[in-house]
Amino acid sequence: MENNHNNFSNLITILQEYWTEQECAIFQPLDLPIGAGTFHNTTFFGTIGPEPIRAAYIQSCRRPTDGRYGKNPNRLQHYYQFQVIIKPPLKNIQNIYLKSLNLLKISEKRNDIRFVEDNWENPTLGAWGIGWEVWLNGMEITQFTYFQQVGGLECNPVTVEITYGLERIAMHMQNQSNVYDLIWSENKFKKITYGDIFQQNEIEQSKYNFEYSDINLLFEYFQKYIFEAKKLIELKKPLLLVSYEKILQASHVFNLLDARKAISSSERQNYILKIRKLAKKIAQEYLYSRKK
């Protein structure tokens, strides 16, 4: 590979090739705005039931409240994660993960790499797990989670999830303190930076998230997505995959309402419960259909 080993595009390629060697199928990102790679349907449905799975994929993520109008050097409302899920977990999974860092030229000898206990919970999906954050020289770069529950169902067997924070890893690899200065890709004609691609988007999306999104319209969207998700679950032959997409859309709308400070702290819990109730119903129906 003649171009820069460290650029963002190559980082993705290296991880995809490495996890392919670990017998993971490489999936494509979900084409919906979601807050984390965990929301991908491969992870949600793949963790339910006894069937083994080994999968990896990149996922673009959106967290409207994290927008900073393109002015903050390391905080974004849109960013990338690389997700790995393996069920049942491999006994030496931490060592396998550390080898992936070595391929990125991040060695334990030259860096302070720590596994810091950090149990994880996602109330919206009725999911939680035990695990660790991985810190690289004091900065979190990865979340390790052993799922105990998803959709309110006990995970049997447990699934291990590894979530790489790609921007943070790339900033270390390229020795950059500003995410917008990262080299995304390059050839003999041109270097393309992260800022070239995403900084204007951060500015505009932040304006939309905090100032211009129509609150009344967002409330209407939320109710319609919830209504449609319920309807699809209650069909004689439920459309569970489609219903799941509707609750993901409702979840994103909820996050936009949160960014607009349109929901009080007491109301907030009610909105989360509406989504979680449907996520649990989808999980139960999916497990039942798999048993049949």
Swiss-Prot record:
<keyword id="KW-0648">Protein biosynthesis</keyword>
<keyword id="KW-0436">Ligase</keyword>
<dbReference type="InterPro" id="IPR045864">
    <property type="entry name" value="aa-tRNA-synth_II/BPL/LPL"/>
</dbReference>
<dbReference type="InterPro" id="IPR002310">
    <property type="entry name" value="Gly-tRNA_ligase_asu"/>
</dbReference>
<dbReference type="InterPro" id="IPR006194">
    <property type="entry name" value="Gly-tRNA-synth_heterodimer"/>
</dbReference>
<keyword id="KW-0547">Nucleotide-binding</keyword>
<dbReference type="GO" id="GO:0006426">
    <property type="term" value="P:glycyl-tRNA aminoacylation"/>
</dbReference>
<dbReference type="Pfam" id="PF02091">
    <property type="entry name" value="tRNA-synt_2e"/>
</dbReference>
<dbReference type="GO" id="GO:0005829">
    <property type="term" value="C:cytosol"/>
</dbReference>
<comment type="subunit">
    <text>Tetramer of two alpha and two beta subunits.</text>
</comment>
<keyword id="KW-0067">ATP-binding</keyword>
<protein>
    <recommendedName>
        <fullName>Glycine--tRNA ligase alpha subunit</fullName>
        <ecNumber>6.1.1.14</ecNumber>
    </recommendedName>
</protein>
<dbReference type="GO" id="GO:0005524">
    <property type="term" value="F:ATP binding"/>
</dbReference>
<keyword id="KW-0963">Cytoplasm</keyword>
<comment type="similarity">
    <text>Belongs to the class-II aminoacyl-tRNA synthetase family.</text>
</comment>
<dbReference type="GO" id="GO:0004820">
    <property type="term" value="F:glycine-tRNA ligase activity"/>
</dbReference>
<keyword id="KW-0030">Aminoacyl-tRNA synthetase</keyword>
